Amino acid sequence: TEYWHAPVAVNDLGWVSFQNDDYVLDLYGLGNDEARQIRAGGPATGDWMQGLAEAHDVRLAMIFPEWIAPIPCSWVAVGELQLAGQAVSVPVDHVSFYAVPAAGGAAETGVMVAKLKAFAASLPDGVQFRFADLTQVNKRNAYCAD
């Protein structure tokens, strides 16, 4: 929350929502009843995530894609936070970061990457942020489904 002062989407509420004045969209559904109802309805495309993101002006998603796939094909993978040591309080040792497009637009990565570089420089020893190859923006993200 120190580096991104805008709404964000997650699928595991936690530190990102602590003392955060900006909206946190919980795609898993614990903190968002609409997401909970959609997920309870069974398998869905990633379109519902894009719709909720648009409704809440979300431009950054930080998620465990294995938990919530398929990811909207319009979302651009910008990087991955690799946690140090054994995962204790989270289900996996990495968090994927996606640029989320505005309604009818393309995902904007320039400002986001600059802010993520500042964030990456602040990480403790052993924790790494790996940036995606943004020259491959047209390449489908690995968790995308039509």
Outline where the language-model segments fall.
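C-terminal luminal/periplasmic domains and tails of membrane-associated envelope-modifying transferases
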Residues: 1-6, 10-11, 15-23, 27, ...
